Amino acid sequence: MALSTFLFDLDGTLIDSIELILRSYRHTMRAHRGLEPPDEVWMKGLGTPLSVQFRHWTDDPAEIEAMVATYRAYNLEHHDALVRPYDGVVVAVRALRHQGKTLGLVTSKMRSGALRGLQVAGLDDAFDVIVGSDEVTNPKPHPEPVLKALERLGAPATGAVFIGDSRHDIECGQAAGVKTAAVLWGPFDRAHLADLEPDYWLERPEDLAALG
C-alpha cells in the first residue's frame, strides 16, 4: 500500500537543535547540581519529555519542575540563534505536501515549543496536525502520540509512516503499527538504531521522495 500519511519527529529530524538542547542541559545541571555530566547521559533520553529525562537526577517532583523551568528559560532565550532546519528538509517536506500527502508532527516538545521551532524553520504552515507532549498522557516511546495524530487526521495506520532520528521514535511508531523511517542526518548513526530494524533508512532529506 502506498504511503499517504507522513508523521515527523521534530528535533534531530526536521530541525538541528542539538547544540541548543545540550547547552540548555549543561546550564540546568550547573545551576541545580553544580556539575556538568557527560552529554551522552542526556543524549540517551533524547526524544522523551524533559520531566522524564530529569528523573535521572531526582525523584522530587518540585525539583524536577524547577529544573524543567530553568531548562526552558535558557532554551527560549537562545532558541532562535541556535536552531535551523537541516539542509534539504524544507524542500523535501514541501514536496510531499505538494504531492497531496497528509503531514503530521509528533514531538516530545510542548506544542508551544514545537511551533516556535517550526516558525524558525519556515515550516509552521506545513502540517495538518501537531501533537505535543502536553497533549498526551503517555509520551514516546509509548504509541499514544502517533495514535493521537492518526485519530485527529482520521487516517489509518496502514499507509502511514513515522519518521524520526531516535530509538524512541522508532519504538513509538512500531508500537502504533505504522511504518518507520530512521533518518541518518541527525545525531544518531545507523549502528545506534540497527537492532530496531526500521522499515526505511533515510540518508538525506531527498530520500523522502522515494517513500511517496
Language model segments and positions:
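Conserved phosphate-coupling serine/threonine residues in phosphotransfer and NTP-handling enzymes
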Residues: 13, 107-109
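Residue-level marker of regulatory loop/turn positions in helix-turn-helix DNA-binding domains and
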Residues: 85, 106, 138
